[in-house]
Amino acid sequence: MADDKSQIKINFFTNEEDESLHTSDAPLYVPVSLKRYGLSEIVNHLLKKDGETDETKPVPFDFLIDGVLLRTSLEDYLVKNGLSSEASLNLEYTRAVLPPSFLASFNNDDWISSLDTINPLSASVKASNMSISQPKILSGSYDGIVRTYNMSGKVEKQYVGHSGPIRSVKWISPTRIVSSGNDRQVRLWKTSIDSNIEDDEEIEDGRTLAILEGHKAPVVSLAVEYQNNRILSAGYDKAIGFWSTNYREMTTIQPLEYDSNVISTSSKKRRKMALQDSTIRRRSPLSFLEGHSQPVEDVIFDFNDATVGYSVSQDHTIKTWDLVTSRCVDTRTTGYSLLSLLQLPSLNLLVCGSSARHINLFDPRVSSTTTEQTNNQKLIGHTNFVVGLSKCPTNDNMFASCSHDGTVKVWDVRSEKSLYTITREQNNAAKGQDKVFSVIWDNDIGIISGGQDKKIQINKGSDITK
């Protein structure tokens, strides 16, 4: 153990665009006992301009060594990496991530299974050549109802049609949404009049535009590719559906042909809904992707190439798909069920949440040549299944995760431990009844999460990296 007089030579540098945060690159000697706070004090002292008083609000900084966030003292870092205090360290400093403080909470009638958002800068808005003035939240619930909320927490519209719990919801455009559920259906919905699309006049706002049939088990996840008008669906029938957001591009199914897919029940409500559905147009998928041996949990499009998709499954695998040929072109195997999936495109990483409670990072460019893929980074912190992931809209290194442990965690891939843990603000649920099922990180709204507590919780998500 080094004493308080032990020092190490360091060089501070930053890649921050703000010139006022740049300081001299002259080397300094500092105590090896310093942690982030002490190093941050030194940088603030170096940045202090002539005439500034001690009352000037300091800027909190994080520090990286060789691209990894420093989460210990300099001394502990040296010991862990087998370095001597006679070494010289280059410390990159960057604005620290601020706590994602609680902002608001909206009530819902049942468990919230899925969330999505739309704002003026959303990809779904840009691709549609439309505009919106205010952000909105889309929710799917276990009561079978899809809802849109405004930022006052008011339900603006409800979409009723599914005969079982909703499992996934996505905005397609300001006037279209898509949902899927335990009733094995994918539904396209019309939210409002769209002058750019010629729809049948008899379809009212908030009504089903088309039912997309083909899955033989619950459909638990959806992905939308806005530029090419495509949808991927993940099913518990071990299959992935490939659809169009425009029902005219898919083959018609006559309602009588698909009566066998209506869940058998004596429920008066379900019989009534099935009768109503008999008048709604139905479509079959453009293709079905088969190859998983267990239920598919999540699916996404590649951010840079819309002809490529990725999926994760309870069969422990991540699969890469060629959507043109409907073929699986790569499979890598882990030792646990994979439950959620996210791409960090600028880092060429796939982020996978697992039943083993940890989060794995994979590079899809590295072809899997063995049955066990081991060269990946593992993030540990959750204590139950990791079922939802969402990328930070302003920082390529950051994302949020949600878990059945009742928390949302904020991560930076440059650190093995989470930066912050968000708990439920009004947690009156019994232990094990506070699962969080969905998280979305929206630049306008914040970090939005929902689950068993029937509440849409919003935490600060913008400006926390400034």
From Swiss-Prot:
The ranges of the WD repeats are 120-159, 161-199, 214-253, 291-331, 333-372, 381-421, 431-466
| Keywords assigned | Nucleus, Repeat, Ribosome biogenesis, rRNA processing, WD repeat
Q: Which GO terms describe its biological process?
A: chromosome organization; maturation of 5.8S rRNA from tricistronic rRNA transcript (SSU-rRNA, 5.8S rRNA, LSU-rRNA); maturation of LSU-rRNA from tricistronic rRNA transcript (SSU-rRNA, 5.8S rRNA, LSU-rRNA); protein-RNA complex remodeling
Cellular component aspect of the GO annotation: nucleoplasm; PeBoW complex; preribosome, large subunit precursor
One GO MF annotation is:
ribonucleoprotein complex binding
CDD domains tied to this protein: WD40 (cd00200)
- Where does the record place the region Sufficient for interaction with ERB1 and association with 66S pre-ribosomes? 105-466
Q: Does the keyword Iron apply?
A: no
Gene3D superfamilies per record: YVTN repeat-like/Quinoprotein amine dehydrogenase
Q: Could you tell me the superkingdom of the organism this chain comes from? A: Eukaryota
Q: Name the family.
A: Belongs to the WD repeat WDR12/YTM1 family.
Put simply, this protein is called: Ribosome biogenesis protein YTM1
